[in-house]
């Protein structure tokens, strides 16, 4: 423990004693100042004496010095002020130049953004490796399939129908049959489904379908006994699939009409998120392939055996985009929303297509005046707020687009009024045995809970056929390279065999040179030629024997007599005979034994006759 400090407390006697001494000291100082005032008075400048002869000149000189000092001080002050003003002007000029430069940069950025908006609202992937891979997989499915099922979204069938793919199939693969599957019929009114079926059946056989939405892995439910387009609301709202029975019957009719004894291969193509994988799972009644709401979930072709007669091929989603991309492509859920640069523009398109009453009923918000006002209210309701209490409009817009593609905002499109008759339909209908009669003559369209969109001639996205052509060229180049590699391998194998034969011949010749003279070598070469000729003849006889219908002709001793002689010579010289030659030799030996037995029997008979004659 440290040493304690002394206390500062003191007695009152000592305290007052100190105060008295201090007061006494102050009195003494005041008394001394009064008694000696000259010591404390400051001396004044006496100035120039009056008796100084040049007093006036001296005063003028002093005055001039004062004026000069004041002028110098004033000049310094003015110079300092001018310097500050010049520096301020330089700062203003630099600031103006900097502002002008930043303004030009801002204008350039705005022009670049405007160009990007005109060219497309999202970062276009182009012909990258993944897109080429998707097209290769789609091409494999089209080439392998006997029947091509193009799955369409019932809400916008023409928007997700790829006419370029259909044209390519009809031109390149004339033996392929195209069938349209109108999926997701539970998301649109029944009248609209019937109208679209009536329109699409003017081009290809078309079936309505509803995929299963059950979550279990096996034993997915199926409903049958009724046409899907005529099903009740309870059947449409259930989780079981509709239309599987009609589709399977159509495929069986196709195989029966063309007398196909093997299994029918069915290729399934379509835009992303139209329900291709869900269609396969509904037909298989198990979760055979994975499904997801993100475009591009299926990346490779997948084969699923439905039964011994039907084989299904799943393919990646087709994105046949060659030109610019507008809001319609984004609203069809063809591209990933994370890559969309301006998701507010598609939301503006959604609000323009739907009535405000419908939007207010769905999102339960107050009336809005603009798209930004709508997104701000939805962001506040869904708590999409960023730092500073600002609404996150981008993420809110993406969520609204997902509501549109996911079915939370119901909508449907009207088919065109002008129907284009097609000559291909009758041909397909006869082979597939599908009834193409008109379902209804007139239908009503009075449903306010849906966003009804009038049909506009859609700007069909052009398919970049160069991807398929490049794939063909690459396949041909690969085939040529493989053929060249096979030829090179065969040539190398032939050269290796010849080298081995030459080495064996050299070894045999060396041995013969050591054991015999030149005459023996000549004889050996002659024998070698005979062996080669015999081997060739044996090979020819073996190939001919496979084509003979009569089994007895294969081992005819008369036709193989020359071969028998040659094999005997080989056996005497080398002690080896080939398997085919050995078989012929065995047959010939058996024939010789039979002949020898007959001769011996004849000799015995002759001896018996001679003995009889002797007796």
From Swiss-Prot:
GTP binds at residues 183-186, 270-277, 314-317. It holds the Pfam family GN3L_Grn1. Residues 1-126, 460-615 are annotated as: Disordered. Residues 467-518, 586-615 have a biased composition (Acidic residues). Residues 10-34, 562-574 have a biased composition (Basic residues). Keywords: Coiled coil, GTP-binding, Nucleotide-binding, Nucleus. Its main location: nucleus. This is Guanine nucleotide-binding protein-like 3 homolog. The lineage of its organism: Eukaryota, Amoebozoa, Evosea, Eumycetozoa, Dictyostelia.
